[in-house]
UniProtKB/Swiss-Prot annotation:
<keyword id="KW-0547">Nucleotide-binding</keyword>
<keyword id="KW-0460">Magnesium</keyword>
<feature type="compositionally biased region" description="Low complexity">
    <location>
        <begin position="788"/>
        <end position="797"/>
    </location>
</feature>
<dbReference type="Pfam" id="PF00211">
    <property type="entry name" value="Guanylate_cyc"/>
</dbReference>
<protein>
    <recommendedName>
        <fullName>Adenylate cyclase, germination specific</fullName>
        <ecNumber>4.6.1.1</ecNumber>
    </recommendedName>
</protein>
<keyword id="KW-0456">Lyase</keyword>
<feature type="domain" description="Guanylate cyclase">
    <location>
        <begin position="396"/>
        <end position="526"/>
    </location>
</feature>
<keyword id="KW-0309">Germination</keyword>
<feature type="topological domain" description="Cytoplasmic">
    <location>
        <begin position="1"/>
        <end position="18"/>
    </location>
</feature>
<dbReference type="GO" id="GO:0071470">
    <property type="term" value="P:cellular response to osmotic stress"/>
</dbReference>
<dbReference type="Pfam" id="PF03924">
    <property type="entry name" value="CHASE"/>
</dbReference>
<dbReference type="InterPro" id="IPR001054">
    <property type="entry name" value="A/G_cyclase"/>
</dbReference>
<dbReference type="GO" id="GO:0046872">
    <property type="term" value="F:metal ion binding"/>
</dbReference>
<feature type="domain" description="CHASE">
    <location>
        <begin position="86"/>
        <end position="317"/>
    </location>
</feature>
<dbReference type="GO" id="GO:0005524">
    <property type="term" value="F:ATP binding"/>
</dbReference>
<feature type="binding site">
    <location>
        <position position="401"/>
    </location>
    <ligand>
        <name>Mg(2+) 1</name>
    </ligand>
</feature>
<feature type="region of interest" description="Disordered">
    <location>
        <begin position="650"/>
        <end position="691"/>
    </location>
</feature>
Length: 858
């Protein structure tokens, strides 16, 4: 599903523009639209915020102007009281002259002078004041029920208005302000508070749209008062002022910029409206809120204080003001933001693409460096540090070689050989990562690894344990594919000690490697080991014997430059079920699987398919008779063992006539106690294939193979001489070469002799299986007694060849001028071959005669 989706996105309907590109454009357009909308909303909110700030600033200025006018009125009231204290008997002219010089903003407020008149003095005062003003004067009262003015009725005292500034309606002169109960409460409150008091009648507020505020300030004769009633009796005058609310609000908003673009409401703390616009007719603020007229308008809410009265202030913006205050800035900013965002995203995508490309190159470079060099070294190189060779005294070195790989590679295609190596080395790389082992290099079919070469790994015992565990896993997992299917096994050598590690780098191809005597010893452990086993030095044995099992007896081997060394074979870990002990016991009883004298034996298990197909490698060999279909061995003789009489699950290919051992399962221990006189019990289903017809053919094939091996050996030795031999040691080298050739020819003669003996044994076995098998053993003993020299050579054939090759390499040094000596050595080798072949034929004839005579004796 994921691959299909990626494929669809990669498909291009327009050249150079895949579907994914158009999808990206759509996403970009959507994202850009969202950014534009967000920018528009953001700057619209910012504009509204600016309008709100302007509203608050204007509202505060209006409130300030109203409060300043109220303060002027209060100061005028106090000034009028000061006039009384200076001249208690001032008349109207004095009143007008004084207020004209002191009162400000007289058009927004009125001042009243009120005097207390007792009922007994009413008539006398009216006559006297009429003469003073030269007009009729009477005391009137206000009827709240009829909302009318009439002559005041008799009562204990009156508070008529005597003077008013500026002149207003003459009907107000003589009006008793104490004619209503609510006004009486206001006067008492002002006397009690001893400060100016605002008179607001709720009934009047609800009946009128806009009202003016009356402020009263009493003048008390006595200073000590015991009760409010007594204070009312002692009060002589009242200085009062009328605050014209509508005129003051209009005057205050005119002084403010755009003040007329606001809608103002003034109300008491209970919500009764004191002031509103002329085109409105609300009684309370609740009605304003419920009307919904100002729901979408900006609002500012505050309060102001006039004398002792606190009023609530609501100011709303008008639609015209908001429209005039808004600009095209939000739209312009959103467009610019969209353009910038598109450019930024385009630039970011391009930069990201370049960074991804650079990061990909760097990752590939780092991965390549990490594959070539250890992590610690690659980190130093990345940080620009110089990589100097380091010495480690606690390293452990591992060598592995695939036994039989040369034969395998000679009969398979290069592609198959490479694929087999890749599969094997990939498995080993995974095991290295699992155990924390550092892979150093591969040389052909050899594998080298180390651990403990860096300073942080300074525990040699721990490093040895890691390497031994790694080696056991290698022998546990890898041989299952190689041995059972391909006829291949591995030899492993391990040694621990000091090494020097570093990077060898010229101008190209840096290479990390380790050097030292420890590396050489580990290589010797591998080369002198047994196929399918782990060969370790005595030092490794001493470090690991507490947790690992080793062979019961040590081996003594000769190591170049070291002399005789004690070595051991690793059997397994004590805490693990996997063990190499059974395979090791088999290798001690039987010759190596890869010895050319050893019969080729392997089992086909049901869980493993046959041959190269088990490793998913194509087999290009079409001739099925050329070799075994399950391995790389080219042999023709077959012994088939079929327990179920239907399918062959056991194959035996051999060069000799000896039957296979009773058990070839790698998990069955084969030692001397399990060998019987009869290799196959009477109840076993083993069928013998008659090979008497193929004896002569096998002899010819064997001779051709031996001659081919001789030629190859001579060529290799000549190449080694040409490369390594020095001029001073040329004569000695030629002698050694002749001796080696003679030894090899003798080995071949011995092999021919053994082949003839085996052929005779097969003829005898055809007459009587069991008895002839015993006689064959006795006859072999007789031959060994009669021909001791041949027996010794036969037992040490393979070992002598290896020792001769080692000696021929260790004694030679570099030389460049030995062509003539090489030709002489080759002629000597050819002569020796002819002589030895003649001796070979004579020995064969003698052996045949002895076999016939022995048969007659039996």
């Amino acid at each position: 599903m994921k691959k299909t989706f990626v494929k669809i996105l990669s498909k291009s309907y327009v050249e150079g523009y895949p579907v994914g590109f158009f999808i990206g454009l759509i996403i970009l357009a959507i994202f850009g639209s969202m950014v534009c909308i967000f920018s528009f909303m953001h700057y619209s909110e910012e504009e509204n915020s600016n309008i709100q700030m302007d509203l608050e600033r204007s509202s505060k200025q209006i409130i300030h102007n109203i409060q300043m006018n109220a303060m002027y009125l209060l100061s005028s009231i106090d000034t009028l009281k000061a006039l009384y204290y200076v001249n208690p008997n001032f008349d109207r002219n004095d009143f007008n002259v004084f207020l004209n010089t002191t009162l400000k903003n007289s058009e927004f407020q009125y001042l009243f002078w009120i005097k207390k008149i007792n009922n007994n003095d009413r008539n006398c005062f009216e006559e006297k004041f009429s003469k003073e003003i030269k007009d009729t004067f009477q005391i009137y009262s206000f009827d709240e029920n009829t909302n009318s003015i009439h002559v005041a009725k008799n009562k204990s005292s009156y508070f008529p208005i005597l003077h008013a500034f500026p002149d207003i309606n003459k009907d107000i002169i003589g009006l008793d302000i104490n004619s209503t109960d609510y006004m009486n409460e206001t006067i008492k409150k002002s006397i009690f508070n001893k400060k100016p008091t605002v008179h607001l009648n709720k009934k009047v507020l609800l009946s009128k749209r806009n009202i003016d505020i009356l402020i009263v300030s009493p003048i008390i004769v006595t200073k000590t008062l015991e009760s409010t009633n007594e204070t009312m009796e002692d009060m002589s005058h009242i200085s009062s002022g009328l605050f014209l609310m509508e005129k003051n609000v209009q005057a205050s908003r005119i002084e403010v910029e755009n003040g007329n673009d606001f809608t103002i409401f003034l109300s008491t703390t209970n919500g009764e409206i004191v002031y509103q616009e002329n085109y409105l007719n609300f009684k309370t603020l609740y009605q304003v809120h419920e009307s919904g007229l100002f729901e979408d308008r900006l609002k500012y809410e505050s309060s102001l204080k006039i004398a002792d009265c606190v009023l609530k202030l609501w100011i709303f913006t008008t639609e015209e003001y908001e429209n005039n205050s808004k600009t095209y800035l939000p739209l312009l900013v959103s467009i610019i933001s969209a353009v910038i965002l598109v450019l930024l995203i385009t630039y970011s995508v391009d930069q990201r693409k370049q960074k991804s490309l650079i990061a990909k190159i760097m990752r590939e470079k780092n991965n390549l460096i990490n594959k070539i060099l250890p992590l610690e070294v690659s980190v130093k190189l990345e940080n620009g540090e110089d990589v100097v060779a380091e010495r480690s005294n606690n390293a452990c070195v591992f060598f592995l070689d695939i036994a039989g790989f040369t034969r395998f590679s000679s009969i398979h295609s290069p592609e198959q050989v490479i694929q087999v190596l890749i599969k094997i080395f990939n498995s080993m790389d995974l095991l290295c990562a699992k155990h924390g082992i550092e892979k150093i290099k591969t040389i052909g079919d050899a594998y080298m690894a180390t651990c403990g070469i860096f300073p942080k790994c300074d525990d040699i015992r721990h490093n040895t344990y890691k390497m031994l565990g790694f080696a056991m896993d290698v022998l546990e997992f890898i041989p299952k594919e190689m041995s059972f299917h391909l006829g291949l096994q591995v030899r492993v050598g391990i040694h621990c000690g000091p090494v020097i590690s570093g990077v060898i780098s010229g101008y190209a191809k840096p290479h990390f490697d380790v050097w030292g005597d420890t590396v050489n010893v580990a290589s010797r452990m591998e080369s002198t080991g047994i196929a399918g086993q782990i060969h370790v030095s005595d030092r490794v044995y001493q470090l690991g014997k507490e947790d690992f099992n080793f062979s019961e007896r040590c081996d003594i081997i000769h190591v170049k430059g070291k002399g005789r060394m004690k070595t051991w074979y690793l059997m397994g870990k004590k805490s693990s079920d996997f063990s190499l002990k059974k395979d090791f016991s088999r290798s001690r009883v039987q010759p190596s699987l890869f010895n050319r004298k050893q019969s080729h034996v392997h089992c086909i298990y049901p869980e493993f398919p046959s041959g190269l197909q088990a490793l998913n490698i194509e087999n290009n060999l079409n001739n099925t008779d050329a070799g075994c279909e399950n391995c790389s061995k080219i042999l023709k003789k077959t012994y088939a063992y079929s327990p179920d009489h239907s399918t062959s699950n056991y194959y035996y290919h051999g060069d000799d006539n000896s039957p296979p051992p009773p058990s070839l399962n790698s998990n069955d221990l084969i030692d001397g106690s399990e060998y019987h006189d009869d290799p196959f019990p009477s109840d076993s289903n083993v069928g013998y294939h008659d090979t008497s017809k193929d004896i002569k053919e096998d002899e010819n094939e064997q001779n051709e193979t031996l001659l081919f091996n001789q030629e190859q050996l001579k060529k290799k030795q000549i190449e080694n001489i040409q490369r390594d031999l020095s001029l001073n040691d040329s004569i000695e080298a030629i002698k050694i070469l002749n001796n080696n050739n003679n030894n090899n020819i003798n080995d071949n003669n011995i092999n021919n002799t053994n082949l003839n003996n085996n052929n005779n044994d097969i003829n005898i076995n055809n007459s009587d299986n069991v008895n002839n098998y015993e006689n064959n053993n006795n006859f072999s003993d007789k031959i060994e007694n009669n021909d001791g020299d041949n027996n010794n050579i036969n037992d040490n054939n393979y070992k002598s060849t290896n020792e001769n090759n080692i000696k021929s390499k260790t004694l030679f040094k570099d030389s460049k001028s030995l062509i003539n000596d090489i030709k002489m050595a080759k002629e000597n080798c050819d002569n020796n071959d002819d002589n030895n072949n003649n001796n070979n034929n004579n020995n064969n004839n003698n052996n045949n005669d002895e076999n016939v005579e022995s048969k007659k004796n039996k």
